[in-house]
Amino acid sequence: MAVCIVVCMIVGYLFGCIQTGYIVGRVNKIDIRDYGSGNSGTTNTLRTLGKTAAIITFLGDAVKGLVGVNLARYVIMPAFHVEGEAYLWLLTGFAVVLGHNFPFYLGFKGGKGIATTGGVIFAFHWQLGLVCAAVFLICLLYTSDAADEL
């Protein structure tokens, strides 16, 4: 069981280290971290590269949260004959967000983890994920400077 926990955490962290904003920036021949706020998240991508790049970044970061947890749930845990341990899903989700926020290969400077956390929530309970997404969008539209860019 301890080995399964360690494997879930390591795989989750490494999966989270995939920086969609950084990759989108590189495709556009820039280092996104050299612009705006200096992080590789969706908002900085929106302000630097526009809506299409931001949507790709947001979806990529959210999907890695969703896939990271489900990878532990449906691949890693069954390989270790571990069933129904929801706390392992939570630990894996936490590791994915940590990997997103603090990727080792970018000097431990990544995004803020909003989209990735949303993906983790969707992995646990998709209905709750929809409610959280609706609340987030309402708050974003009414309180954020980023809403002006949408």
PLM feature spans:
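Cytosolic, membrane-interface loops and tails of multi-pass inner-membrane proteins
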Residues: 22-52
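Conserved small/polar residues in nucleotide/adenosyl-binding loops
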Residues: 142-150
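Helix-boundary and loop/linker segments of multi-pass membrane transporters
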Residues: 43-47, 81-83, 109
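Feature marks short, highly hydrophobic, charge-poor N-terminal signal-anchor/signal peptide-like helices
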Residues: 1-7
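Short, non-helical or kinked segments that cap or interrupt transmembrane helices
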Residues: 31-42, 105-118, 145
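Interfacial segments of multi-pass membrane proteins
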Residues: 46-51, 72-76, 113-141
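Alpha-helical transmembrane segments in multi-pass membrane proteins
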Residues: 8, 12, 17, 21, ...
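Nucleotide and nucleotide-moiety/phosphate-recognizing core
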Residues: 4, 53-57, 63-105, 127-128, ...
